[in-house]
Amino acid sequence: IILNDPDAMVVVIPDLYPPNVAFTHSTAKELFEGIQRNFLEILHQKKVKDEKSFIQRLKVFCFKYDLEALLLAAEDERRKFLGMKFLKRQWTIPVEDQNHENPPKKIVEKLFQKSGNQYNQVIDAPLILKKCNDWDIAEACQQCFKPFIEFLECVS
């Protein structure tokens, strides 16, 4: 598509966690650079001219973790969904700064267990996040999610 449509863009939204999948990376910068390298290799293999034009149309928004980081940011909506009046926060703020040993997905699973529920990413995450304001979540996830929301605002 990007080869045949000069207005097309490629938008990539990988998770930083787990690290070192596909290529070595432990930071968002390393993940971004690795994706760019792989993209350039594909352009070389296809003997594409004017690589700069294609690189400019590659947009990479590296989420640090799975979408569960967004669920941690959606405190009120998550708490209401779980039917809990009070929930002691036992994670790092900003939510994008969790560590790989205790990623947001594990934290969310524990929160669901405490409420007597089992977390199902496919069902529960959309039900919680659809009640959220994108910009409220973006303000809580400024490192990686906010730039993506800003990008979406520009292309809408």
Identify the residue ranges that each predicted region occupies.
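C-terminal accessory helical subdomains adjacent to catalytic cores in phosphodiester-
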Residues: 2-156
